[in-house]
Every structure is written in C-alpha cells, then in structure tokens.
Amino acid sequence: MVHVYKGLFLECDPPTKQFVEYISKQEHFEVIVLDETHLFLQGGDEKVINSIQRRIDDLQNQNTYSVFDKDQ
C-alpha cells in the first residue's frame, strides 16, 4: 500500500536540522527525520518555510561577529 503525505523536503546541515526540530515543537508541524541532513516537514506549507527561514536568519545574525558591530 502506498501512502502519500503533503509536506516539504528539507536538506540542511546537522546543526540546522536540530534547530528545525526545536522550532517544530513551537510552530506545531511534524518533522520526519530521514537521515543526518534530510528532513520531511509534514503539513508544512509556505508559511512554515518562511517562519523557519526567518528564525534561522535571526540565529545566524546573533552568531555572526562583525568588526563593524564593535563600539568605538
């Protein structure tokens, strides 16, 4: 028997995978782990992808050092 699920396929590095799994608990979508770098977001739609992208961008901005951020 074949099962079809609507969702999104996501390829990412392992730390990003862990962050997406963390976000899934807050945003209420199901994550199916396929392997170390691939996830399937069941029930995910464009709204979910935009939310994930925004949260990842925020995390990267917090963890990026810039010489220009330093107070002079």
UniProtKB/Swiss-Prot annotation:
This is General transcription factor IIH subunit 5. The gene is gtf2h5. It is found in: Nucleus. GO terms for cellular component: transcription factor TFIIH core complex; transcription factor TFIIH holo complex. Belongs to the TFB5 family. Keywords: DNA damage, DNA repair, Nucleus, Transcription, Transcription regulation. One of its GO terms (biological process) is nucleotide-excision repair, preincision complex assembly. It comes from Dictyostelium discoideum (Social amoeba). Component of the general transcription and DNA repair factor IIH (TFIIH) core complex, which is involved in general and transcription-coupled nucleotide excision repair (NER) of damaged DNA and, when complexed to CAK, in RNA transcription by RNA polymerase II. In NER, TFIIH acts by opening DNA around the lesion to allow the excision of the damaged oligonucleotide and its replacement by a new DNA fragment. In transcription, TFIIH has an essential role in transcription initiation.
